[in-house]
């Protein structure tokens, strides 16, 4: 009897201990869950600093400086504007202004006057740029029209919300009171609460969950079934390309003292762009026209042949213009004057674009030439015009090659034209090819890999000429003559053997001329076909041809 009672007591104690252990386990789980929930739940109060939401992304952590709010105006630092909107934003010391460009707009805003100039037109502002603690701040609301953005500041959440007006935006209506979660997990932070009937921005909607942005700028997830009436409130806006196929451009050069060529009866099958040498910079930095009645007839001929017209704007390309070009590039005022002149002639003659052909520049002016292109590009885009820029091969002398920042030019301009000729040119003391295949391909690879230029923006410029080199018995170059492709057969004696060079992908000839030796690396249809193959192989934007 006693043993039975003890056994019953022992069993009862075991059950109690088990119940106690179970209660302890449940309590521990409950504490852990509550702790997790408490940790995962965000109190919907004010933030200590202002958040920045751009196109439905919270980029606050990427801010270089805190957002500044003074007297009701919101300022972003120059560094942050550069990070989020205009990587080429620029402080001009000469005029004491901030210069910023974006798409079709270029704007100037100073540090004293409440004025902003956009594409040459002034308008009043509520404030101006400021310099505080060695940081330049610019009022973001004054740049709405420049960056094409919508700005909303929600004081209750300290969220600065910026939307690009050229990007798609979808909206929906909340169908039931809901909590917005930080993730799609069952237990997740609550970032906001929304009521039935509230309008939200739909960022994505898939697999039963919608990522949304609330009216006060909070971003999170809600079950898809809790939103209705999803509509596209704004479509993506993309600028149409003037030429959708490959560019086939022909430079049509004539000197400053000559008249435009008469092309009345000229057939140009396959060519879709012509670039006559209509414009030059004089020694004072002014844009000079060389069009006249012959040029007007040329324009009419080009249009009748369905050709776009991108005339050259040249700085003459000789060393005498180096100082003038440098003075223009080193002054924002002079750059702006030249840009206005270019825009005016584009409007006057109803041009489709221009081709910048600046050569023989100082290496130290490289960045300023890029600035000129950065500042010109939005004015061209405003009118729907194409900006193409000629550059030489990546390796070479300071004034011939190293004066170009090909990466920036390729990024900003519609097209960058690689003048893949004069490998051995007028200044060469050694005989050689005008445009060897291996040299051209090496240059292209540098454009694509080192300079990181989009292949579709690169136009390959090829020569329709070569040179006849004359050497003495010691190999010294005595003279060199430019020979047009159409005159090559009449220049080389008929009994001279043409040898194919598979590295250069062209024929080579060498023959005696008395005690001297003539050499020529021939440009013909076969050598051109080899180079044209690079356009399709590397998916380039097209072809440009130069004839001397």
Stretch-by-stretch model annotation:
Residues 248-252, 271-276, 309-313, 354-356, ...:
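Hydrophobic faces of well-ordered beta-strands that scaffold small-molecule active sites
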Residues 275, 337-368, 415-430, 544:
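Active-site groove signature of glycoside hydrolases
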Residues 197, 209-214, 222:
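SH3/SH3-like beta-barrel fold
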Residues 231-341:
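Glycan-recognition patch characteristic of GH18 chitinases/ENGases
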Residues 253-269, 332-348, 398-407, 522-536:
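Short, acidic/polar
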Residues 2-206, 228, 233-240:
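Primary recognition of N-terminal secretory signal peptides and signal-anchoring hydrophobic helices
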Residues 283-293, 340, 366-491:
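Substrate-binding surface in catalytic domains of secreted glycosidases
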Residues 464-531:
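Glycan-binding loop/region signatures in secreted carbohydrate-active enzymes
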């Amino acid at each position: 009897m006693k043993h039975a009672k003890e056994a019953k007591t022992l069993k009862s104690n075991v059950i109690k201990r088990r119940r106690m252990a179970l209660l302890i386990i449940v309590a521990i789980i409950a504490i852990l869950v509550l702790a997790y929930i408490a940790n995962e739940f965000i109190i919907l109060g004010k933030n200590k600093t202002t958040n920045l939401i751009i196109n439905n992304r919270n980029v606050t952590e990427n801010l270089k400086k805190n957002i500044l709010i003074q007297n009701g105006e919101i300022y972003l630092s120059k560094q942050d504007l550069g990070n989020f909107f205009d990587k080429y934003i620029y402080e001009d010391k000469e005029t004491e202004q901030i210069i910023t460009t974006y798409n079709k707009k270029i704007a100037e805003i100073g540090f004293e006057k409440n004025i902003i100039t956009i594409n040459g037109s002034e308008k009043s502002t509520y404030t101006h740029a400021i310099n505080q603690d060695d940081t330049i701040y610019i009022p973001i609301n004054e740049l709405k029209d420049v960056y094409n953005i919508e700005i909303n500041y929600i004081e209750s959440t300290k969220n600065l919300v910026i939307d690009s007006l050229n990007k798609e935006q979808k909206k929906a209506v909340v169908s039931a009171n809901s909590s917005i979660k930080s993730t799609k997990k069952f237990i997740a932070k609550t970032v906001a609460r929304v009521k039935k009937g509230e309008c939200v921005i739909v960022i994505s909607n898939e697999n039963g969950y919608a990522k949304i942005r609330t009216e006060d700028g909070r971003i999170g997830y809600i079950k898809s079934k809790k939103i209705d009436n999803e509509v596209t409130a704004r479509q993506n806006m993309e600028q149409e390309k003037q030429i959708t196929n490959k560019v086939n451009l022909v430079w049509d050069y004539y000197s400053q003292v000559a008249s435009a060529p008469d092309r009345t009866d000229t057939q140009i099958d396959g060519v879709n762009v012509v670039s006559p040498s209509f414009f030059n910079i004089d020694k004072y930095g002014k844009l000079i026209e060389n069009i006249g009645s012959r040029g007007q007839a040329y324009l009419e001929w080009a249009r009748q042949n369905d050709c776009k017209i991108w005339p050259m704007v040249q700085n003459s390309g000789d060393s005498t213009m180096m100082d003038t070009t440098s003075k223009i590039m080193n002054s924002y005022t002079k750059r702006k004057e030249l840009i206005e002149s270019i825009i005016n002639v584009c409007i006057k003659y109803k041009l489709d674009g221009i081709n910048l052909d600046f050569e023989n520049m100082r290496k130290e002016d490289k960045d300023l030439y890029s600035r000129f292109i950065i500042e010109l590009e939005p004015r061209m885009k405003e009118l729907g015009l194409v900006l193409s820029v000629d550059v030489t091969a990546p390796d070479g002398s300071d004034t011939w090659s190293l004066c170009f920042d090909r990466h920036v030019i390729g990024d900003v301009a519609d097209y960058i034209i690689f003048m893949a000729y004069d490998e051995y040119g007028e200044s060469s003391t050694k005989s050689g090819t005008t445009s060897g295949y291996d040299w051209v391909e090496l240059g292209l690879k540098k454009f694509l890999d080192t300079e990181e230029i989009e292949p579709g923006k690169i136009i390959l410029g090829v020569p329709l000429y070569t040179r006849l080199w004359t050497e003495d018995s010691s190999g010294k170059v005595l003279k060199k003559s430019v020979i047009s492709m159409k005159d090559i057969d009449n220049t080389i004696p008929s009994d001279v053997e043409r040898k194919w060079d598979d590295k250069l992908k062209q024929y080579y000839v060498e023959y005696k001329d008395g005690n001297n030796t003539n050499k020529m690396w021939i440009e013909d249809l076969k050598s051109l076909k080899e180079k044209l193959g690079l356009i399709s192989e590397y998916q380039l934007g097209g072809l440009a041809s130069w004839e001397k």
